[in-house]
Amino acid sequence: MKKIMFWITLIVGITVVFGSCSSSEDTTTTSSTSLPGYAATTLSGKIGTDWTFKTGRMVVPSSSSGSYSYDMTNDNLSNACSSSYTGTSSNPSVYFSRDAAPEAGEHELSFTSGNVKTVAFYDGTTIYIIAKGKITIDTVTTTAVTGKMYAISGSDTDHEINGTFTLSRCCIDNSTYSLCSE
């Protein structure tokens, strides 16, 4: 009987010790880099020259295996869906694509094995692959995608943009892209 009491006491004692040593901590995911907050103004900054977002689109792929492409320019294009987005030194463009449909949330840009989320700045001669920054999608509707972006080429403030955007959501219709209606 003494042996049974000894083992019960030992087990209860160990349980109490380990129970009192455990801790419950709230953990949050934070960025390993320190990025500034989003500007509350229209997406703007510099891409070699002063740049302010004016026209943009998010193209829905025509097949389930395609990717969603995002195009932005500081040029006033008459039709965001059917216009050509060609970057020039005076009208640079911003491009990126994702395999998944856009949904609300923030994504940090990165260029690591298994996690490539970049943005490209194109100034008519050079494509700058941007892996420092973040993009937040706020809303996705049938016809539009709204969000915020901060992106910088390393520490080069001559290639840095920050602010809000609204993109037309474009779908293919009779071999041409037009505003989605689905």
Regions found by a protein language model. Name each.
Residues 1-20:
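Sec-dependent bacterial lipoprotein signal peptides
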Residues 21, 141-151:
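A short hydrophobic beta-strand element
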Residues 31-54, 60:
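Polar/acidic, low-complexity leader/linker segments enriched in S/T/G and N/D
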Residues 136-145, 156, 169:
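A short, structured loop/turn motif at beta-sheet edges
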